[in-house]
Amino acid sequence: MSSSLCVLPWMHLATHPNGGASLCCRSNHNDAISWARKNDNLVLLDNDSLNDIVNSDKFVNVRQAMLDGKRPVECEGCWRDEDNGIESKRQYENRRWSHIIKYLEKTA
């Protein structure tokens, strides 16, 4: 398993009042950096499907970065916690969903 993998970008999203969707509640929301995007345009719940969101450029790129062992900037909240010895949401969710991680490693 990649040391930076998190199950959430495969099976979860956080929604926002304006219709935007991001990777999770702990992801970096500065300038909507973690929000679903396709061709640099926000993918919004009122215009797009859930499939469009979870397969948006942003979600796919973050999943691939995790599979490649990179630490996406969108997930800096978890990296900061882990670097300070605090259990992150990523670590908690990976433990909670450990039975599906082997399936995630096959696809971004």
Regions found by a protein language model. Give the residues of each.
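Short, basic/aromatic recognition patches
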Residues: 1-7, 11
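Secretory pathway export signals and precursors
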Residues: 2, 20-21, 71-74
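Conserved alpha-helical substructure of the radical SAM core
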Residues: 3, 32-42, 81-108
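Cys/His/Pro-rich metal-binding microdomains
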Residues: 7, 22, 76
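A structure-centric signal for secondary-structure junctions around beta-strands
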Residues: 9-10, 18, 39, 72
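N-terminal pre-triad scaffold of radical SAM enzymes
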Residues: 10-24, 102-108
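C-terminal accessory region of radical SAM enzymes
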Residues: 26-80
